[in-house]
């Protein structure tokens, strides 16, 4: 399947469908070089305010990331949205982008990045450090997963 990479209203470059894509279709594999999390961390500091948190890193598991700046394809330009039309499927350290619903020709492909971060961050921190520009109706304001809230303890008789 050929995809079109062009300017996006969300941020920078985006990937657009050049034809209709049916729900459930595997659209593209996210390719690049497998690197350790330590190597990925050395490439970017979480709290560097001068950086727009723009990387081509995709965490595959607890050990490795795919660095799409090295041997990556069009998938590295797929933007985030809090209302995605695509989802990620990880199989044996390979990452595939699948259509969550039918996608029309010319529509931008987007998935929820759902960044995992330090649990000490508040939503205000996440919105400041990882701001979202998707403008979806239900936008949570950040590319990151919301912090987990402790469950209230239930008193049992």
Describe each model-derived feature in a short phrase.
Residues 1-89, 152-153:
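Catalytic cores of histone-lysine modification enzymes
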Residues 81-157:
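C-terminal SET catalytic tail plus cysteine-rich post-SET Zn-binding segment of SAM-dependent SET-domain
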């Amino acid at each position: 399947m050929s995809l079109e990479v062009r300017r996006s209203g969300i941020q920078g470059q985006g990937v657009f469908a050049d034809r209709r894509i049916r729900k459930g279709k595997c659209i593209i594999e996210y390719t690049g070089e497998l690197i350790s999390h330590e190597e990925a961390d050395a490439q970017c500091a979480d709290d560097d305010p001068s950086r727009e948190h723009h990387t081509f890193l995709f965490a595959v598991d607890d050990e490795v990331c795919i660095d799409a700046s090295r041997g990556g394809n069009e998938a590295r330009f797929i933007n985030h949205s809090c209302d995605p039309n695509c989802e990620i499927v990880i199989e044996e350290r390979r990452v595939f982008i699948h259509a969550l619903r039918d996608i029309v020709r010319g529509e931008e492909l987007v998935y929820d990045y759902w960044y995992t971060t330090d649990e000490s961050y508040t939503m205000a921190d996440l919105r400041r450090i990882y701001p979202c520009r998707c403008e979806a109706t239900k936008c949570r304001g950040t590319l990151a997963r919301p912090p987990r809230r402790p469950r209230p303890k239930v008193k049992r008789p």
